[in-house]
């Protein structure tokens, strides 16, 4: 849902205009090694070519059968930093929840398999401060690092647990430098990283092609006055926006509703012909973003019956109904002849749904409320070539590490290093989550008979029958990136 105004910005460094944006540099990796890549940077997650596998799946007659498909892998990583900084538990929970929805809304429907969670924060200042920890200066609305690390991991683990997805990979980094020449580095605004791996059938790996008169359906919970303006708030520097707007922008999680939606998606993709022809999840910007996205991607327009949008709070204004970011919703396009079948699936899974509109040939978004039209805008106004952000900067010499003093207390210093959160055991972040739910986990974080949390990777099986699967690992070195970004990547 992001327009990436920073990553797509035009950069001028030392009075020299850069040819590529940051996003261009990111995409270079896939351009140079795209052999097994089916889709990247154009859907809700990336799709990587897989293998032919046997799976257990219900037939059209609702009997479990052994079927064989070309199964591809999907991968997604994003961050949910601003909400986690403002309200750690719901911020991290909806970060994981939003990433799960992105996986499910890939192509014409996919299955999330295992999760990835990471945290970067400044010094924790647990009880008494350590010698290297200075006084923490934060805006009142920003949670402290220790508060974030007490609440946010529970939020992420809670959502993964309730949804029914194992979280078998992650990292935790504490970094905050001292001031040198009035500059310091740290994570007062944290990084909350949410990612995951899933599977998708080859036939479902790309979005479908639809025409006019396809039905637009919203599945999931009703509209509530939750998460208003989160897409804008997350793009501001911390402390820039109004404090009340900051808190209003944080979404609230409902993992059970998301599980119901995922079961509907799974049931649709089990059919001999997938009922879902197009799907997007509802995230930042709410329906005001998701529905125009669907219209733009299908090269069509959409007419919406405003009264058909499910609403829990009748006092909400049209703007609030259209723009709220109530979680656990998806927007789908289905054929009119599939509606009864779709209704029966939603009823069985107890998943709320509503047919809110249809596709039209005129490339515009119309919100119709009886004789009144709240919104009638051409897609070109929403998705046209927007002016790019221009950023000027200069390179600065970075002070190298100071050499260690010859007189060191090895035993004391070793203890300080080993108890530093970036070095010490991460077991407290691991055992809060179910690592085997779903039955496809092959390698989680725990190793050996004593279950020591030292695994370097996560591994899952493609199916209950297969001996092949997906492996993922993650690495980060911000303390080196401060001085040598290239070395930190190597």
Q: What is each PLM-predicted segment?
A:
Residues 1-490:
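Glycine/proline-enriched, intrinsically flexible loops and inter-domain linkers
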């Amino acid at each position: 849902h992001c327009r990436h105004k920073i990553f797509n910005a035009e950069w001028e460094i030392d009075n020299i205009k850069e040819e590529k944006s940051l996003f261009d540099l990111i995409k270079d990796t896939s351009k140079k090694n795209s052999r097994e890549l089916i889709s990247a940077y154009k859907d809700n997650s990336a799709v990587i070519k897989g293998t032919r596998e046997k799976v257990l799946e219900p037939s059209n007659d609702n009997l479990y059968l052994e079927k064989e498909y070309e199964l591809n892998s999907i991968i997604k990583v994003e961050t949910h930093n601003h909400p986690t900084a403002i309200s750690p538990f719901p911020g991290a929970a909806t970060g994981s929840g939003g990433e799960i929805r992105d996986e499910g809304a890939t192509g014409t429907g996919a299955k999330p398999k295992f999760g990835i969670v990471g945290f970067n924060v400044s010094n924790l200042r647990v009880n008494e401060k350590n010698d290297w920890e200075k006084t923490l200066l934060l805006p009142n609305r920003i949670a402290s690092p220790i508060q974030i690390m007490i609440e946010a991991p529970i939020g992420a683990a809670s959502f993964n647990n309730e949804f029914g997805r194992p979280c078998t990979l992650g990292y935790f980094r504490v970094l905050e430098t001292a001031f040198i020449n009035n500059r310091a580095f740290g994570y007062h605004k944290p990084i909350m990283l949410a990612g995951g791996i899933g599977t998708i059938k080859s036939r479902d790996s790309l979005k479908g092609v639809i025409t006019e008169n396809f039905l637009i359906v919203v599945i999931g919970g009703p509209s509530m006055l939750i998460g208003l303006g989160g897409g804008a708030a997350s793009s501001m520097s911390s402390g820039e926006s109004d404090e009340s707007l900051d808190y209003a922008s944080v979404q609230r999680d409902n993992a059970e509703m998301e599980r119901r939606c995922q079961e509907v998606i799974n049931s649709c993709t089990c059919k001999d012909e997938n009922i879902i022809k197009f799907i997007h999840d509802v995230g930042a910007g709410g329906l005001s973003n998701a529905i125009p996205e669907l219209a733009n991607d299908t090269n069509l327009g959409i007419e919406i019956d405003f009264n058909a949008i499910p609403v829990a709070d009748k006092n909400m204004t049209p703007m609030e109904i259209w723009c709220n970011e109530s979680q656990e919703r998806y927007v789908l396009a289905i054929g009119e002849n599939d509606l009864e079948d779709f209704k029966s699936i939603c009823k069985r899974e107890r998943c709320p749904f509503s047919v809110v509109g249809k596709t039209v040939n005129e490339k515009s978004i119309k919100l119709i409320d009886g004789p009144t039209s709240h919104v009638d805008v051409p897609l070109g106004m929403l998705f046209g070539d927007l002016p790019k952000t221009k950023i000027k900067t200069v390179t600065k010499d970075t002070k190298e590490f100071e050499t260690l003093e010859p007189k060191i207390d090895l035993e004391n210093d070793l203890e300080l290093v080993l108890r530093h959160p970036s070095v010490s055991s991460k077991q407290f972040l691991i055992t809060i989550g179910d690592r085997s739910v779903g039955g496809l986990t092959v390698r989680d974080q725990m190793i050996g008979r004593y279950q020591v949390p030292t695994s370097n990777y996560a591994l899952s099986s493609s199916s209950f029958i297969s001996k092949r699967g997906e492996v993922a690992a993650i690495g980060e070195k911000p303390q080196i990136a401060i001085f040598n970004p290239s070395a930190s990547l190597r």
